[in-house]
Amino acid sequence: VCTTTHIYPEKTMPCLVSPAQAEIAAALEKSPCICVGAWSENGKFGPPELPVGTLARLADYVIVEADGAKRLPLKAHAAHEPVIPPEANQTILVVGASGFGRPMCETVHRAPLAAQALGVPEDTVVTPALWARFLEHEHLHTRVLVNQADLPQGRELARRLAAGLCCPVCAAALQKEWIECLS
């Protein structure tokens, strides 16, 4: 696990700071999942010094967090986002089910961008169909994961979102380690 921006160091796995290839290989012998990066601002991890392509030769899978949403469940991306490594063969967009049924201005990071793209006011209530339309407009994903699907009606909201998308969609409750593929 690493980032192209900034993340808090993972507490559930070993974190290696500016590791050499040999250190990564040794860590992967002991643990199936590790976090690599370099210290950045505010105690966060920044991008690793080694290229993602090098990491991919060392690990079976490399998960790169490419963009944050300021702890909001939904996000509209600026033109320079997300920072996706050229080696990426999948982009999994994570959305939070808690963003549905509430005004865009309360649940979407960069709500003005989403409102403008959709031609709606920022206080428009976000529905799965509306958000599917927006995600298809952005077209920054190959798959979508709807987190927080354990909330009341969460699975149904995820199914409605999936109905409007042209890609595989999974519903999940990541903190409870539960996931269900919907399409």
Place the predicted regions along the sequence by residue.
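Short, high-confidence coil segments that cap the C-terminus of an alpha-helix
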Residues: 29-33, 59, 88
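Conserved catalytic-core segment of NTP-binding enzymes
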Residues: 42-58, 67-168, 176-183
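Generic recognition of cysteine residues
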Residues: 2, 15, 33-35, 105, ...
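N-terminal phosphate/diphosphate-binding loop that engages ATP/GTP or pyrophosphate donors
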Residues: 1-41
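General beta-strand structural signal in soluble alpha/beta enzymes
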Residues: 1-4, 34-38, 62-66, 72, ...
